Swiss-Prot record:
Keyword Hydrolase recorded: no
Biological processes annotated in GO: regulation of translation
Alphabetical keyword list: Coiled coil, Host cytoplasm, Host-virus interaction, RNA-binding, Translation regulation
Source organism superkingdom: Viruses
Alphabetized HAMAP family for the sequence: ROTA_A_NSP3 (MF_04094), ROTA_NSP3 (MF_04090)
Similarity comment text for this entry: Belongs to the rotavirus NSP3 family.
Keyword Cell division: no
Region (Interaction with host ZC3H7B): 167-231
Region Dimerization, annotated ranges: 147-203
Region annotation (RNA-binding) ranges: 1-146
Name of this protein: Non-structural protein 3
Coiled coil: 163-234
Length: 310
């Protein structure tokens, strides 16, 4: 189990977030414009440096690890820490650290009065109220028991100079900024809605055009299919008619068979191929007619006959 270590890490992370919020809130109250990412980066760098350089982070995580080990039944580390804390050298070192911290606080302008007051009193905020409760710490109770607390009756109320803040003007400025931001957001939203409507209208019109074109394509396809069927029927009837007409004529059987084979070779299914077949058949008929004419012409000359066209 590492629940205590996780809790300590969570407390450290929460402290960092609180430091960021405190920094940004202070800048906002002072009316200073800032970049959140820059503030976040600077606070994180300083916070990590202080926590690492001072050893506070490692100290907290180490104590949390010791508690987790004790909870898991491993008391060796806890016993060593207890012996270390009870050692006189450790106590002397802690006194030195406390004295160093006091001198550091004094150098930062935090005098003894402020340190004592902060150690003796704490403020408890009342939820939902502007007032607060001042609580005495255990140190204050010990001082009262030891008689180290006195009441100063010669206290003279001095007029404190307080910097007044015009909250009304501040509120009006914030309200103007909010209205300006709201107007810009509304303008962007309105323009986006108009663009979306235009895109939808274009899409609907395009869909209508596509539907109309698909309908026209379907009509043309139906018309083409009908034409193809009509041509197939026409070609089939033409072949049958020519075949019947040929059989009714007094032609030799070989010629009828040849013409019948050519008629049967016509592609009735595909009109384009049928036209090519008809062209070939007509060419053959013309060629046969030309040959017959030449034979007849030669025969007339051999018989000393002449021919004329009327």
């Amino acid at each position: 189990m590492e629940s205590t270590q996780q809790m300590a890490s969570s407390i450290i992370n929460t402290s960092f977030e609180a430091a960021v919020v405190a920094a940004t809130s202070t800048l906002e109250l002072m009316g200073i414009q800032y970049d959140y990412n820059e503030v976040y980066t600077r606070v994180k760098s300083k916070f990590d440096y202080i926590m690492d350089d001072s050893g506070v982070k490692n100290n907290l995580l180490g104590k949390a690890a010791t508690i987790d080990q004790a909870l898991n039944g491993k008391f060796g580390s806890a016993v060593r820490n207890r012996n270390w804390m009870a050692d006189t050298r450790t106590t002397a070192r802690l006194d030195e650290d406390v004295n160093k911290l006091r001198m550091m606080l004094s150098s930062k302008g935090i005098d003894q009065k402020m340190r004592v007051l902060n150690a003796c009193f704490s403020v408890k905020r009342v939820p939902g109220k502007s007032s607060s409760i001042i609580k005495c710490t255990r140190l204050m109770r010990d001082k009262i028991e030891r008689g180290e607390v006195e009441v100063d009756d010669s206290f003279v109320e001095e007029k404190m100079e307080v910097d007044t803040i015009d909250w009304k003007s501040r509120y009006e400025q914030l309200e103007k900024r909010f209205e300006s931001l709201k107007q810009r957001v509304n303008e962007k939203y309105t323009s986006w809605v108009q663009k979306a409507k235009k895109v939808n209208e274009n899409m609907y019109s395009l869909q209508n055009v596509i539907s109309q074109q698909q309908s026209q394509i379907a009509d043309l396809q139906h018309y083409c299919n009908k034409l193809e069927v009509d041509l197939q029927n026409k070609i089939s009837s033409l072949v049958s008619s020519v075949e019947w007409y040929m059989k009714s004529m007094e032609l030799p059987g070989e010629i009828k068979t040849d013409i019948e084979q050519q008629l049967n070779s016509i592609d009735v299914i595909n009109p384009i191929n049928a036209i090519d077949d008809f062209e070939s058949l007509i060419r053959n008929i013309i060629l046969d007619y030309d040959r017959i004419f030449l034979m007849f012409k030669g025969l007339m000359r051999q018989c000393n006959y002449e021919y004329t066209y009327e």
